[in-house]
């Protein structure tokens, strides 16, 4: 009489109990602090939600970068007393003319010192500067990656929405937010660059002249919005005294009149700069600007040393919270344009889930009937192992908080058929041994041992394909790959460990004369 391996019994019990605990939140609400309470995340196609395709405005970023480069070049040319004229940015290139071709050598040294990745084109005394292809691609990748991270933080500031963000092509970003019931809110927070800057107000400028286009050199006209006076214009200095890059905290609050405000704090460097600004400009107005729109322009009453401040304006509670969120996560490197928008209703997702349930149930019942008709009692053991495999799949999806999509359901249904493949291989090998006239115990042991290598090889090749789909696929393809991978691992465990254990228990304690396979 054979002895049952204790490690298999213990392992099977532990895995099954753990799987039940992990899968339970999908059926009932768990409030215990000691038990898992996360259920499976449903993808956009099952849960409904918003699907946005964003275009990264790289041309604007490149133009701003070239403008900064042009300013740096002007300072260096003046410093080295090199004469030039008509220095301007056009079509993402810097164009200028030098007064004498003899200064070209010195000019090239200055440009290479500023940025060695700049390509210099020379036509007599006319110079054209542009980024090299490698620098252009590096900047593009940097801007897209930064945009993806900022979008992720804006959309999922609490870490509970599970958005899907994928780069598509050179400068497109696909954003999917399952369960989003307010796509207009998403469009609002993504449509703002959230570039916060501090400027001094140009008190000497004439507003009426500025509106007509006569803006003093070094200043600019911007628009504000007052609760009491409506829209109005103000002239501010172009020079940025301080930017939102130094902010560490931002939160919505209320002032003494119960009006919504945004409170903020700077880091050490920002606090020092802010203190110097307020100390040196007491009595002047400090304009707080967001995306070239005036938020407020309070009078500086004295030095502010602590690095804390407030932004007042025509805020509602919602807009104050929204601005605080945008300031906390930081500004986008460049504007984003929404070029495609789709909303998937929850009813469509519910229909997909119901169809998936029906297909899965039909497939499961058909497989179970086939196994019992073909293999009798041990076919029933394969069905029990199949049920446990489905339990393990459900538990692992819940444990890893994987997102289940419609293709993922297809992967699970496919796993139902694949799960019994291993059992079929084993049972057919057992049949071959029984035809040789050997004992039941020997046939079972030999059948499992001889089929083991084949089962491992076939499943490993499928896993390789699943990994490739996950690495190179996007969206729904990844969901299919995840479900397929988890399904393969679960079915291998149930077929090799669970089925063998059930058959061993049956043979040891019930001592059947025949296995019903002949």
Swiss-Prot record:
GO-annotated cellular components: plasma membrane
InterPro entries per the UniProt record, alphabetical: SecD (IPR005791), SecD/SecF_arch_bac (IPR022813), SecD_1st (IPR048631), SecD_SecF_C (IPR048634), SecD_SecF_C_bact (IPR055344), SecDF_P1_head (IPR054384)
Subcellular location: Cell inner membrane
GO function term, MF aspect, one: protein-transporting ATPase activity
Keyword Transmembrane helix: yes
Gene3D superfamilies tied to this protein: 3.30.1360.200, 3.30.70.3400, Multidrug efflux transporter AcrB transmembrane domain
Spans traversing the lipid bilayer: 9-29, 356-376, 377-397, 406-426, 463-483, 486-506
Membrane disposition: Multi-pass membrane protein
This protein's UniProt keywords: Cell inner membrane, Cell membrane, Membrane, Protein transport, Translocation, Transmembrane, Transmembrane helix, Transport
Superkingdom of source: Bacteria
Primary localization class, coarse: membrane
Assembly behavior: Forms a complex with SecF. Part of the essential Sec protein translocation apparatus which comprises SecA, SecYEG and auxiliary proteins SecDF-YajC and YidC.
Name of the protein this chain belongs to: Protein translocase subunit SecD
Organism annotation: Rickettsia prowazekii (strain Madrid E)
Gene name of the encoded protein: secD
